[in-house]
Amino acid sequence: MIDKIERYFKHFDFDIRETHNARFLDQKVTPDVLSIVIDCTLTYIQNNNIDEFTSTDIRTSDYSNENIIDIFGKTDVNNPKAKNEYDKFFHQPLKALASAKILKETKRGRQIYFTILNREILEYISVKEKNSLEFLNIYLEKVLRDSSIWHLFENFFNYPTKDNFDFLKVQYEIFIIQHTPINGKTEVRRIFPKILNTLSFKRKKHGTIKGRFSKDIITRDELMYNRRNWKDISKKKGETRKEYELRAKNEVENIKIAYVKYTLNKAKNIIKKLHLTTSEVTDEFANGEATQIHHIFMKSQYPEISSYLENLILLTATQHFTQAHPNNNTSLINKDYQLLCLLAKSESIQRYNHIYSKEDFLYVIKIGLNYVFPNEIEFDELQSRLIEIYNTN
């Protein structure tokens, strides 16, 4: 899928000196926000059977409200007091994708309407934060290369020192102020960390924290809007340290639970949409409508991969309750049928490689079987090796 995105971008020139667009990325465009906003967008389009939409349409949809409140610990999306914050939360990712030519924007009066230019890339972004991050990395590098300032970033990545960071930051500010309507450093400095840290994380490099050169290599958590650390939650006035710590940790735990629930439900919906009512396992029990989403490696035993698409497979009720789980006992797994599910899933992953990830499938196998395969392994060899493993255990 990365190759497809790169090929698609070759049709466009994102040179800031020509577009004068300083907001090709904005503050709210983080991997987690971008992914969930696009998931909300695609869900809204499907539910309403429309081609054109506004950010307000997405913001006020039931699906957005159900998930944003719990996952981000926010108030109701229709709360008037939160309107300004939510407008940015939903609008900025859509604007960024319009800049990237994934969406098309049309202004009529004061309202901006969006339509889809590349659904495949949108679906890829919506699947998981990891995909969203891959997209942002490709897009940002493309913008900076087209604008002939990539060498400034490359120099910093090759020689990550405070002096080189300061030089990069100043040169970027000068460039943006010179070629876009932004005329002050403050606004440039709000957006710069989102750009640098996204690129830094992918390259395992230093970046920027609170406007300064980071002492450590940028971590994934630094990129996210939804920081999953209780210390990021503010202490309330009059609250004791113990009360604050207990409340903050509970809030973070509730957010984590909500996020796992959301990702699992999203994964199940994606699989049903991909495979419709046809079982992924072709055997004598595949007749009839496939309605059951089965965890190849049990959710109770392997919670860390419970919401991975590559660990979920669509089966008929007969397959699920008589083959995958012997005698309808969902606490047991039929190892022979587990192998069939893995082999069938590998076929699905090859067929729908813009949705599934071979790398994530290998991770699922690593957790479930405690066996590591190299990322370079071909699917034919992988299938043969899986058969060997199950036949010798």
Feature annotation, model-predicted:
Residues F24, N49, K273, E381, ...:
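Acidic/proline-rich low-complexity IDRs
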Residues E310, A317-N393:
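C-terminal structured domain segments
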Residues E253-Q292, T316-Q319:
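Short cysteine-rich loop/turn motifs with clustered Cys
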Residues K101, H295-S300, T316-H320, Y390:
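Short, flexible loop/turn elements at secondary-structure junctions
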Residues E85-Y86, A96, I271-T278, H294-F297:
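Short amphipathic alpha-helical surface micro-motifs
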Residues I2-T263, L332-L340, S346:
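Mixed-charge, low-complexity interaction segments
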Residues L276-I313, Q323-N328, K335:
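Histidine-centered nuclease catalytic patch
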Residues F114, L314-T316:
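Short beta-strand element of the conserved SAM-dependent methyltransferase core
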